[in-house]
Amino acid sequence: MPSVFFSYSHADEGLRDQLEKQLSMLKRQGVIETWHDRRIGAGEDIHRAIDDHINTDDIILLLVSADFIASDYCYDIEMQRAMERHHSGEAIVIPIILRACDWHHAPFGKLNAVPRDGKPITQWPDIDEAFLQVAKAVREAAGRVTRTASAPPARAAAAATPAASPAPQSLGPRSSNLRLAKSFTQRDKDQFRHDTFEYIARFFENSLKELGERNAGFEGVFRRVDANRFFATIYRDGKDVSRGTAYLGGETWGRGINYVHGETTSSNSSNESLNVEADDQTLFLTSMGMASFGRDRDQKLSQEGAAELLWAILIAPLQGTRY
């Protein structure tokens, strides 16, 4: 059975947990087995345990972020050894882009990264869809390993490598399912909501600017009213063709992030509303689905996904009319 090694920064442990959940079907089917440093037992030599797996596992997942690149251990030790084994054909290295960072110039920058086009997982509207693409890539890589199983095993080749450290004595079989449920306080949710509103504001401001630069005759105007509200307007040849207001909270909609057509300082109406929710691993946003007649209601939205949903409402009048 192909073995999978996670190389990641502990700053990204929450994302690693979510990825491991998406790989559950592969493990249940006996397609792969997984290992990461949280499986190192008490009393085991940490560096030897990692050395054993980085030198012998069949598939190495590089969970890439700015923290991963900044980590001397991840970048200089784990990644460098992984690339050596990849180039020698001993292992398959798959870069998984978790968060936006300058990764194209790294030694793994020429490898085909996932999700599709190397778009960071945290920027996908639906994070589950992004992790599903990763799971499919791991399944395909495991198939390649299985088909070449008649070749000399990677473990034997690695054992002959002088740089490889001796394997620690095994403490016996153990589950990789050691992930524990996380809990989020109301303070966590409030902070996430405010951070998301700031993200949406920046997203709209930049998108309105880019819209005008790309399309002759069009101008996008962003106006920040206060900490909890902004206006967005699109003009064509000086005539307003779409207006929207985004605001936090409100008299009717409670703690949500709300969007309403037109410009208003009132907080008692909404054409779409986003709420902060949590599962046992992460915070995310859900839509009331008012603008899409309920189609988007069940999606777990990232900050970018939430911003894209509201932006789609603002730009919809322009995309339905041929100018």
Curated annotation (Swiss-Prot):
Ranges where the TIR domain occurs: 1-142
Gene3D superfamilies assigned: Toll/interleukin-1 receptor homology (TIR) domain (3.40.50.10140)
SUPFAM superfamilies with a match to the protein in the record: Toll/Interleukin receptor TIR domain
Domain of life (superkingdom): Bacteria
Keywords of the record: Plasmid
Family annotation (InterPro entries): TIR_dom, Toll_tir_struct_dom_sf
One biological process term in Gene Ontology: signal transduction
Protein name: Uncharacterized protein y4lF
Organism: Sinorhizobium fredii (strain NBRC 101917 / NGR234)
